Amino acid sequence: HKAYPMVNLQVQSAPSGELLEGLITGRLDAALVDGPLTLATLDGVPLCEERLLLICEADPPPVRGPQDVAGRSVFTFRRSCSYRARLEAWFSHDRVAMGRAIEIESYQGMLACVIAGSGVALMSESMLDSLPGKDSVSIHPLAEPFASATTWLMWRKGMLGANLNAWIDLQQEGKVLPDTETRAIA
């Protein structure tokens, strides 16, 4: 906001599915979502790569795969959350039934439940690193193809204006992903 004080930026947090719906219906101008996506009505650019971690109580047995946490409660966001879909796919990939999904509305709440030994959760390494209490859990990186997620900035085709372009430029100054053509994903 310091560089562009006249720009009115409103931020909203929601699962990727809900943000994409907001884009498609025109309620949102842009959204940060798990990608890449190939929707004919949207364009986007990758902003960052996130390492995904399964978090468990502090001293569990080793977690080598979903069979090691079968039947455990899973703390997650609503069904429209892309990380939840990834975790469900991780279980399905090895034909392991996922435990009961318990919907929690914050990462802090998920972490507290895991610290208490009530189940497991999936979150990005950067999110976990930002939370107090992160040292009270054990972390277990997922194997490919579930090990990482790329956060994309998405917008409706033809709606990339000067304000959004300037924001993209600011975000990409510290970017760690290889250069990608800004307008081509669909």
In which residue ranges do the predicted regions lie?
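Central regulatory/effector-binding core of bacterial HTH transcription factors
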Residues: H1-A40, I104
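Hydrophobic residues within well-ordered alpha-helices
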Residues: G22-I24, V69, A112-S118, L153
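A ligand-binding cleft/hinge motif common to bilobed small-molecule-binding domains
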Residues: G35-L42, A89, Q108-V137, P145
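Short secondary-structure boundary segments
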Residues: G35-P36, A58, E125-M127, T151, ...
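Flexible hinge/capping segments at coil-to-helix
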Residues: L39-R79, N165
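Residues embedded in well-ordered beta-strands
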Residues: P46, L53-I55, V120, S138, ...
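Secondary-structure junction motif
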Residues: S73-D94, G161-D169, P178-R183
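A late-sequence structural motif
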Residues: S138-E181
